[in-house]
């Protein structure tokens, strides 16, 4: 680590408690807003764990929603909410494919991957941005709800 990187890290670490507090506030709003949305599976909160809340993942419930993750993702983008997809099953990467690993080896991991995405969660998010994200998620869950 260079001196410059260390100086940047030092100044950022001083902000960490404030950042964590804000992430907890946003996470609490999301948890409350989505608790009764059957089209979603939410991350389980562990009361004794204190996390940095790096991501807020949602998983589409395939039994309750009529769209793919790609459709939901694109619809969120159309609502001006940028989502991300993370955690590709590691054995899908070329290195592991070259070692003989193939898609289908871990069907549960692939099923979960096919429905997960993260919604915005960052310390500088305004309350209005949080509300807009909640509104977009709930609107699309209602729109794509299986009848």
What are these regions (language model features)?
Residues 1-147:
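PLP-dependent aminotransferase class I/II
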């Amino acid at each position: 680590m260079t001196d410059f990187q260390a100086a940047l890290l030092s100044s950022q670490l001083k902000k960490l408690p404030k950042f964590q507090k804000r992430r907890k506030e946003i996470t609490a709003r999301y948890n409350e807003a989505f608790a009764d949305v059957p089209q979603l599976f939410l991350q389980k909160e562990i009361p004794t764990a204190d996390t940095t809340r790096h991501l807020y993942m949602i998983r589409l419930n395939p039994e309750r929603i009529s769209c793919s993750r790609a459709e939901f993702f694109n619809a969120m983008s159309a609502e001006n909410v940028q989502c991300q997809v993370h955690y590709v099953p590691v054995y899908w990467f070329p290195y592991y494919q070259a070692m003989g690993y193939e898609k289908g080896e871990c069907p549960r991991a692939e099923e979960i991957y096919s429905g997960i995405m993260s919604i915005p969660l960052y310390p500088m998010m305004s309350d209005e941005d949080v509300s807009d994200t909640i509104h977009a998620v709930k609107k699309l869950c209602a729109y794509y709800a299986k009848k």
